[in-house]
A protein has these predicted regions:
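Beta-rich carbohydrate-recognition and catalytic domains
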Residues: 1-18, 23-70, 76-173
Length: 173
């Protein structure tokens, strides 16, 4: 059975900081999370990446704000690069942008770094309403389970697709 050895608060700023992921790459620990006013789909929701060598002192190395509700970041380290993927809820085109209804679409984004401090501008990957959840490197390629939905509230019509990429940017079934 696992035993908790220590517990340390990394961020305490009064915001809703959640949906974390963590990895170790090139001698540093990386922690990413979403920061927002609340749990709900209420822009702004930004993705933050922190870096540490000792798990005690943390430095912010990236903050992503695509204009929508950015959330659920996931880190991937593969050789000489570190990537973060995240989903962004955006008001559906030509709607009033109400945050209380289901007129939002989901875009998956990726940002890549070769040094852990300089990150590319987030780029949309794959199609609208496909959430690329957790990327893995295996067999000389990148793989991802992506779930798809036409509308956010239509849970009965969700499907899952296995996607493959050679470069993290172009994904195929």
């Amino acid at each position: 059975m696992a035993e908790l050895i220590s517990l340390q608060r990394v961020v305490s700023d009064g915001y809703h900081n959640a949906f974390t992921d963590m990895t170790r790459w090139n001698g540093h620990y990386y922690l990413c999370y979403r920061v927002a006013q609340s749990h709900g789909i209420e822009p702004p929701g930004d993705v933050i990446i922190l870096r540490s060598t000792d798990l005690t002192q943390w430095q912010q190395v990236a903050r992503f704000d695509t204009g929508g509700d950015d959330r659920d970041p996931k880190l991937l380290h593969a050789g000489d690069l570190l990537a973060v993927t995240f989903g962004t809820w955006v008001p559906r085109w030509r709607t009033a942008g109400s945050r209380t209804d289901v007129t939002h679409d989901l875009l998956s984004h990726i940002s890549i770094s070769r040094d852990g401090t300089s990150w590319s501008t987030p780029r949309q990957i794959y199609g609208v309403n496909y959430w690329l959840w957790r990327l893995v490197a295996a067999d000389g390629a990148y793989w991802c389970a992506a779930y798809h939905f036409g509308r956010r509230d239509d849970r009965d019509m969700r499907t899952v697709h296995l996607l493959r990429s050679e470069d993290l940017l172009d994904w195929r079934l």
